[in-house]
Amino acid sequence: MMQKQSITQKLANPTRCMALSGTLLPWLAGIAVILIAYGLYRGWTAPPDYQQGETIRIMYIHVPSAWLGMMGYALIAVSSFGLLVFRHPLADVSAKAAAPIGAAFTMMALVTGSLWGKPMWGTYWVWDARLTSVLMLFFLYLGLIALRTSIEDESLASKLTAVLALVGVVILPFIKISVEGLSIPWLGLEIPAWNTLHQPSSVFRTDGPKIHASQLYPLLYSALGFTFLFFTLHMKGMRNEILRRRVKALRIAEVDRAREREAVAAAE
């Protein structure tokens, strides 16, 4: 009697993944465009901030970019864990597809943060705990991409990249703790926030958002839209990688068949 496959097992099949992603991609892309356009429009027409003036509008791109830079690395870490522990067929595909996208969003966060910092801090860059840790995250992305492309053996490259990704995941809580600290009363753990110019979160706080509704809602729309954009690009990247591996397998098979024909002809 055949056992019923779980959803995870079904999605582990590249053919099913291609079929499902082909259906979802247009919807994800459409939702992303609508939400980003609406969020940025609401942000552009929102009143200026009473302290930061018009420069507050950079927030509607900077904050989603920073969030997705960290989320992208978390996705790589989870995918790497799935590859090393569960040997999931698509885990490496997911990690490879997410790396350049996460790197792009992290770079966008660094650039927009510098543009935002100039009028607020008087300089484009300071070696602040938050800024430096996000820069380290960007270098980690570049390291993952460089390591993978420098090794011809795909199996070895995927495993080494997965190990590096899991080692580097410690940067994510470091980024968060650098400006907000960490408090776990039941463990007696208290890590104070560092002396940093970067402001703490104004949205996800235990005491509620510290941002006016006229700025909060455009930011949420924009963040949600960019999140849909991330998954659109990620899904498209996975499809491209699956197709690339299929083409490579076909070429290898064709070369093997050609060698067999040559060997048979030589034997005759």
Regions found by a protein language model. Name each.
Residues 2-268:
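Polytopic transmembrane helical bundles with strong interfacial aromatic enrichment
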